[in-house]
């Protein structure tokens, strides 16, 4: 089965849980961005966290995650929709370091430990919800955990992991979010904490073929999980030539005239999917008339 996300409840509704397998989604972003392994892990972790956060929304709602650390990869931007479609990019994709002391890709060194994680939610209202927290580790799972606790006042645990092949393709990518609901007592908390301390890295579980449902069972206990929904997830970009044309029109007549006279056309590349859009001199003349 391809990539998908599972929504569930645990401990009779006292825990809200999400888990996903996102190997293909992350690999498509890596392929389009030509990221090197450490940057791939950072981008993939952020995309999976964004995908699970968006799955908490309803209908046509969407969100944007922005991670801005002081590390060499620069900003990570992810757009996720409630329907399971996500896109993302990293400003400097060609960043890679040796493995850290734990034998893992050194995401914190690439992202940096000083900076911010911000989330903008668009739920169809006039005003968007915006939350921002400082980075606490740069490893990203811990940073999203802190975001939920600090910005949304929801005690949570976030795990996201990416394994990268020697040829830079993605071997496995997966993640989970566990959130305590009102009524979760100390016994539930200690049970979850005990399981979190003993479970292998989530990327290893995905590599071994463990589906999201079984990952949640391992995190919460077989008898404590009630699956609510499964939904497919994918890398998807909403860019189009029409959308780029509207952006060119918004630049105004002077800018468009300069493109026509100085360049004889225009070429633009989407940050997210690296699709290249070309506009001929004649097409720009038409846009000039509409501006």
UniProtKB/Swiss-Prot annotation:
One of its GO terms (cellular component) is cytoplasm. Its main location: cytoplasm. Redox regulated molecular chaperone. Protects both thermally unfolding and oxidatively damaged proteins from irreversible aggregation. Plays an important role in the bacterial defense system toward oxidative stress. HAMAP family: HslO (MF_00117). Gene3D superfamilies: Hsp33 domain, HSP33 redox switch-like. Under oxidizing conditions two disulfide bonds are formed involving the reactive cysteines. Under reducing conditions zinc is bound to the reactive cysteines and the protein is inactive. GO terms for molecular function: protein folding chaperone; unfolded protein binding. Belongs to the HSP33 family. One of its GO terms (biological process) is protein refolding. The gene is hslO. This is 33 kDa chaperonin.
